Structures are given as structure tokens and as C-alpha cells.
């Protein structure tokens, strides 16, 4: 049987007062020991994105402050893929489910690159949507980071991007043209500070977006949005959502990682068992002490799942989230941004 590994990426925030941590940790499933897997990565690697190859378990891509890197041996060694380093970090990576040779990389400053040969050559896509098109605030800054991307498995030319304080972007032609799907949604920065996006497979046309203000649902490919009813976790009546994942092979079951704010003492998981029609908070049996930031599933055994807080707490479940055990990172390893499993 092929050995599965779980990966956790750390990246320091540069805002005043926030500590800088970085690195990539790896754990073999069935073991309880974490090890650094940074050979060949840049010094003090800031890992904000992890993408595991859908057909080759040993091939993993990570996004760093110096562009994407690739490993073909489960993270034992890394090499930089051939894309010009322009000084901005990679925040998201996405495989085309129809052709895993095709890979997208989402950068800071709302840039998206596409490779059609597993990262050997890259082309910047014409993303022209900017922050003022989403808000009505005069003199607003350009939209920032493409924090996550998602693709419609039934039509891989349909791609979405979640942009920090920039809403949701959509392309219907594999990235050649983009449009803003958040017009009219702006109430304040909270509603368009978008952290993730997911194309639901259970109901065609359904798209989910998570943000600082909570969870939003569209039933018309992002044309219109409504707020999902989930338990609020902060004084604003909001839930700070950071990751959203569908269980492999089970399109009715969707998970959301959340907390009360970016850095908080509340970490929570929410689950839908009906394709996103209703949501409930999961009783984990353990108490996360910081905001839940990331989720990952073992594609070969989807009932095996992992979650992590930005404070470095990692939890594992072998029964689809019914029970959890702690698998904490080494002391001092915090600022978790990304997870992957393969």
C-alpha cells in the first residue's frame, strides 16, 4: 500500500506585532512525528499554498515567497519550477482536474499564472479586475492576494478566484477572460475579504465563498449570493471562515474551518451533509485554542482527514470527523496557512 503523508505549510505575517514563522512540516500517516521537509526550498520558506498531484501521490507543489516549488518524492527534495521570481509570494495553487499537466498559481497583487506542462513554462493570465470595481470607496487600493482558486470538475474551463478584500473572480474560458462576481455585495471590507471558494458538485451551479464575514452561497455560478446560516463566533455576529473543502467522493459533505477572527482563541469546524443546504458546528471532543485555518483529506481514504489552527495545533480523524486526536506541531511552529495530504 502507498504511504500517505500530510503536509503543513507555515508563513509569517508581516503586519506589525505579528511574529514571523515559516517552514514546511511533513508527517507520515500512521506516525505521530513531524519533520521539516525543506531541502531545496528557499531560506526560511513561507508556505502559503500546497497542491498534491491528483494522479502521482509523490508529486507535491508548494507556493513560496519566491514562486512555486515542486517535489517528486513526497517532499524529500524540492526544485524551483521555471517561473520568473518577481518578488511577490504565491498564495494559491490549483490543478486542472481534466489534465493535471495544467496548473494555476495565484499571486499577490491579483496575478494568476498558468502552466500547461507541469510547471516547466508559465504565462500570466489577463486578470484586470481591481478593488474599485468591487467597492464604491474612492481611491481604493488594487485588489490584493488570490488566496484560493477553485475549478468546476464538470467543466474545468470554469475557474474561480477568492481575492483578499476583492471578492470572487470568475473565468469561463480557462483564465483568458475574468469578471468580478461580487458586484453589489460590498457592505464593508468584511463581506469581500474572501478567503476561499468551492464549486459544489452536488447541485450544478452552486458555488460557495468564505470570507471574514462568514459563508456565502450562490446557485447561479456566482451571479447572486446569499449568506449561509452558520453559528456566529464574534461580537459582530460573524464567523471568520478560512478554508472550505468537499470530501473526496462525497459531494454532499462539505467542511469549513473557522474562528472568531484572524488570531483568536476560538477554533471551529462546520459541516454540511446535504450539499450546503444546512450547516452545523462539529463537536470535536477536543478544544482548539486558536482559529481553525486549514483542512486536508487523504484522497485514497477520504474518511481520514486533518485540520490545523494558525497557532500550530493539528488534529486528525480516521472516521470522517466523528472523533479527533491531537497531532501538534513542534513547539514554536505556528502561523499555519496551508495543508495537503497524499
Residue ranges: model-predicted function:
Residues 1-342:
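Extracellular glycan-interacting surfaces
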Amino acid at each position: 500500500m502507498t504511504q500517505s503523508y500530510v503536509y503543513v505549510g507555515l508563513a509569517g505575517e508581516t503586519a506589525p506585532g505579528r511574529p514571523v514563522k515559516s517552514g514546511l512540516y511533513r508527517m507520515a500517516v500512521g506516525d505521530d512525528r513531524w519533520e521539516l521537509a525543506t531541502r531545496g526550498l528557499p531560506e526560511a520558506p513561507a508556505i502559503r499554498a500546497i497542491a498534491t498531484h491528483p494522479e502521482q501521490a509523490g508529486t507535491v507543489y508548494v507556493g513560496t515567497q519566491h514562486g512555486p516549488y515542486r517535489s517528486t518524492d513526497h517532499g524529500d527534495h524540492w526544485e524551483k519550477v521555471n517561473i520568473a521570481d518577481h518578488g511577490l509570494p504565491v498564495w494559491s495553487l490549483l490543478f486542472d482536474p481534466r489534465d493535471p499537466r495544467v496548473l494555476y498559481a495565484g499571486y499577490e497583487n491579483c496575478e494568476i499564472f498558468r502552466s500547461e506542462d507541469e510547471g516547466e513554462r508559465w504565462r500570466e493570465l489577463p486578470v484586470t479586475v481591481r478593488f474599485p470595481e468591487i467597492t464604491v470607496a474612492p481611491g481604493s487600493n488594487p485588489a490584493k492576494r488570490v488566496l484560493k482558486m477553485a475549478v468546476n470538475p464538470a467543466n474545468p474551463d470554469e475557474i474561480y478566484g477568492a481575492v483578499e478584500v476583492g471578492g470572487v473572480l470568475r473565468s469561463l474560458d480557462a483564465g483568458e477572460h475574468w469578471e468580478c462576481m461580487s458586484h453589489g455585495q460590498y457592505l464593508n471590507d468584511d463581506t469581500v475579504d474572501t478567503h476561499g471558494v468551492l464549486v459544489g458538485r452536488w447541485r450544478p451551479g452552486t458555488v460557495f465563498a468564505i470570507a471574514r464575514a462568514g459563508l456565502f452561497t450562490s446557485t447561479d455560478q456566482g451571479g447572486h449570493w446569499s449568506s449561509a446560516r452558520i453559528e456566529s463566533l464574534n461580537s459582530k455576529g460573524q464567523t471568520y471562515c478560512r478554508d472550505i473543502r468537499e470530501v473526496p467522493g462525497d459531494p454532499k459533505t462539505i467542511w469549513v474551518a473557522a474562528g472568531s477572527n484572524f488570531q483568536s482563541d476560538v477554533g471551529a469546524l462546520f459541516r454540511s451533509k446535504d450539499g450546503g443546504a444546512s450547516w452545523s458546528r462539529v463537536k470535536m471532543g477536543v478544544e482548539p485554542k486558536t482559529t481553525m485555518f486549514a483542512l486536508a483529506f487523504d484522497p485514497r481514504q477520504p474518511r481520514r482527514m486533518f485540520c490545523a489552527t494558525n497557532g500550530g495545533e493539528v488534529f486528525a480523524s480516521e472516521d470522517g470527523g466523528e472523533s479527533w486526536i491531537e497531532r501538534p506541531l513542534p513547539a514554536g511552529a505556528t502561523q499555519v496557512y496551508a495543508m495537503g495530504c497524499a
